[in-house]
UniProtKB/Swiss-Prot annotation:
It comes from Oxyuranus microlepidotus (Inland taipan). This is Natriuretic peptide TNPc. It comes from the Eukaryota. Has a high stability. Is highly resistant to proteolytic degradation, due to its extended C-terminal tail. A high percentage (72%) of this protein is still present in human plasma after 24 hours, in contrast to human atrial natriuretic peptide (ANNP), which has a half-life of less than 3 hours. In addition, it is highly resistant to the metalloproteinase and serine proteases tested, in comparison with ANNP. Keywords: Disulfide bond, Hypotensive agent, Secreted, Toxin, Vasoactive, Vasodilator. Expressed by the venom gland. Snake venom natriuretic peptide that exhibits vasoactive and hypotensive activity. Produces a near complete relaxation in pre-contracted aortae by activating the natriuretic peptide receptor 1 (NPR1). Stimulates cGMP production through the natriuretic peptide receptor 1 (NPR1) with high potencies for the rat NPR1 (EC(50)=100 nM), and very weak potencies over human NPR1 (28% activation at 10 uM). In vivo, reduces both systolic and diastolic blood pressure with no effect on heart rate, when intravenously injected in conscious rabbits.
Length: 39
């Protein structure tokens, strides 16, 4: 599938799990999870 999020960012392709868990490469770069931001 082409619609992968953070495709190969951690050495393996992430799908919707990246979106939901905030583990997607794009998620971390553009919008870091608040729980990791210190909230």
């Amino acid at each position: 599938s082409d619609s992968k999020i953070g495709n190969g960012c951690f050495g393996f392709p992430l799908d919707r799990i990246g979106s939901v868990s905030g583990l997607g490469c794009n998620r971390i770069m553009q919008n870091p999870p608040k729980k990791f931001s210190g909230e």
